Amino acid sequence: MAWASSFDAFFKNFKRESKIISEYDITLIMTYIEENKLQKAVSVIEKVLRDIESAPLHIAVTGETGAGKSTFINTLRGVGHEEKGAAPTGAIETTMKRTPYPHPKLPNVTIWDLPGIGTTNFTPQNYLTEMKFGEYDFFIIISATRFKENDAQLAKAIAQMGMNFYFVRTKIDSDLDNEQKFKPKSFNKEEVLKNIKDYCSNHLQESLDSEPPVFLVSNVDISKYDFPKLETKLLQDLPAHKRHVFSLSLQSLTEATINYKRDSLKQKVFLEAMKAGALATIPLGGMISDILENLDETFNLYRSYFGLDDASLENIAQDLNMSVDDFKVHLRFPHLFAEHNDESLEDKLFKYIKHISSVTGGPVAAVTYYRMAYYLQNLFLDTAANDAIALLNSKALFEKKVGPYISEPPEYWEA
């Protein structure tokens, strides 16, 4: 069937680190479609979607006191140091227990602050047992300034237990500032960064059989240095069904991160559309009530995922010393369906569906409707993602001095 080839072709557009469905499930769904076993194909798609939506993600962050653990955790969660629920920074570590910090927007994601092994009396193996190592998807070991032997021993113990760990060297900005201050004539930024990375790698290799990657991260601007590479590596190593929630949990600080989110959501929308298309004979009225109700919710979710929700826009406008209304003039999504009349998106869809139903009948109208809903969700998604990318260089965006965006209605509105 043509569906099978289109299904396979769609997912070939995405790299491994972006793909939210396993190759096994892709092959299984294609096989069922080719054999015209649509109900079985739908069952697999439904299971994939359930796994994607309900997948828990537990990230363990450990390191010695003063290494910048709390700053790293707060940044991962998109929480300011003074906001409610932030991991305390600048404090002396006194707890011997792990502390969970849930993601503020994604309850399935929890980042665990583990006490540095040097502050406990445990051996590396006992430390991991005490910290319930089997509950985490991966470990991030945070280190700053001088390399600690405890870091290497912990990395070795994690590797021996078959767990993934990632070594993150923080406070890179401080290192560069100090080097430039004391060696202004010979200062070479790239050379300093290479020396720091080599120093950490060499010490890790002394304890490990392999050469684990070292990621240099700024505590001031996390989008700099190796953080984008760390994101990519984590996405590559995670199981396919957990990549979706992890990509959505990341802040939209780089174009690569925004595109990971876009790719992940596009695949989810496609899977939902394939499922809907296979069940296109269900009563049309039920579809309208189910999906029309969700259109506004879907659009608002996309805004939230890309940092374009009302609260985020208020903060950005305040930072730029602008009113929110003046700020929104430069974005597309607030004006996506703006018209000269006040007809809502739902009203337009409902009118269109009534027309199609009267002309073609239920099943054909159902397929047409789902095709349109798929288009709309992708339109929402691309608009939000493109606005988020534009905001990465807000100065250039505002210098264009464009007027309000008024989107023309899609061609299929008019019968």
From Swiss-Prot:
Keywords, alphabetical = Cytoplasm, Endoplasmic reticulum, Golgi apparatus, GTP-binding, Hydrolase, Immunity, Innate immunity, Membrane, Nucleotide-binding, Phosphoprotein
Q: Specify which residues bind GDP according to the UniProt entry for this protein.
A: 66, 68-70, 90, 171, 173, 219
Q: Does the keyword Membrane apply?
A: yes
**UniProt catalytic activity:** GTP + H2O = GDP + phosphate + H(+)
Q: Which residues form the IRG-type G domain?
A: 55-237
| Record-listed (Microbial infection) Phosphothreonine modification sites | 89
Record InterPro entries? G_IRG_dom, Immunity-related_GTPase-like, IRG, P-loop_NTPase
Q: How is it modified after translation?
A: (Microbial infection) Phosphorylated by Toxoplasma gondii ROP17; the phosphorylation leads to disassembly of IRGB6 (TGTP1/TGTP2) polymers into monomers and dimers. Phosphorylated by Toxoplasma gondii ROP18.
Kindly state one GO CC term assigned in the UniProt record.
Answer: Golgi apparatus
Tissues of expression: Expressed in thymus and lymph nodes, predominantly T-cells. Not expressed by immature CD4(+) CD8(+) thymocytes (at protein level). Expressed in IFNG-stimulated macrophages. Expressed at low levels in unstimulated astrocytes. Due to sequence similarity with Tgtp1, it is impossible to assign unambiguously experimental data published in the literature to Tgtp1 or Tgtp2 gene.
Answer whether the UniProt record assigns the keyword Cell membrane to this protein.
no
**What membrane topology does the annotation report for this chain?**
Peripheral membrane protein
* Expression induction or repression: In macrophages, up-regulated by IFNG, but not by IL2, IL4, IL10, nor TNF. Up-regulated by IFNG in lymph node cells and thymocytes and other cell types. In astrocytes, up-regulated by TNF and IFNG; when both cytokines are combined, the effect is synergistic. Due to sequence similarity with Tgtp1, it is impossible to assign unambiguously experimental data published in the literature to Tgtp1 or Tgtp2 gene.
Task: List locations, semicolon-separated.
Answer: Cytoplasm; Endoplasmic reticulum; Golgi apparatus; Parasitophorous vacuole membrane
User: What family is reported?
Assistant: Belongs to the TRAFAC class dynamin-like GTPase superfamily. IRG family.
Q: What does this chain do?
A: Involved in innate cell-autonomous resistance to intracellular pathogens, such as Toxoplasma gondii. During avirulent type II T.gondii infection, recruited to the parasitophorous vacuole (PV) membrane, leading to PV vesiculation and rupture, and subsequent digestion of the parasite within the cytosol. Not recruited to virulent type I T.gondii PV membrane. May confer an antiviral state for vesicular stomatitis virus.
Could you tell me what this protein is called? T-cell-specific guanine nucleotide triphosphate-binding protein 2
Q: Which gene encodes it?
A: Tgtp2
